[in-house]
């Protein structure tokens, strides 16, 4: 399955992978740790992508 993907699907999955990052440390320091996570974090097992 890893090789046999459409290019468009692979690009969408790569975009989702880039978006699934934690909040930078400097943001947490700047907001005095009020912002620890962002609501679009996605766990690979809990929430599946619709791609």
Swiss-Prot record:
SUPFAM superfamilies registered for this protein in UniProt: Ribosomal protein L39e
InterPro entries named among the record's database cross-references: Ribosomal_eL39 (IPR000077), Ribosomal_eL39_CS (IPR020083), Ribosomal_eL39_dom_sf (IPR023626)
Species of provenance: Methanothermobacter thermautotrophicus (strain ATCC 29096 / DSM 1053 / JCM 10044 / NBRC 100330 / Delta H)
Gene Ontology biological process terms, A to Z: translation
Gene3D superfamilies: Ribosomal protein L39e
Keywords, ordered alphabetically: Ribonucleoprotein, Ribosomal protein
GO molecular function, a single term: structural constituent of ribosome
GO cellular component: ribonucleoprotein complex; ribosome
UniProt record similarity statement: Belongs to the eukaryotic ribosomal protein eL39 family.
The name this protein goes by in its record: Large ribosomal subunit protein eL39
Domain of life per record: Archaea
Family matches, as NCBIfam families: PRK01242.1 (NF002316)
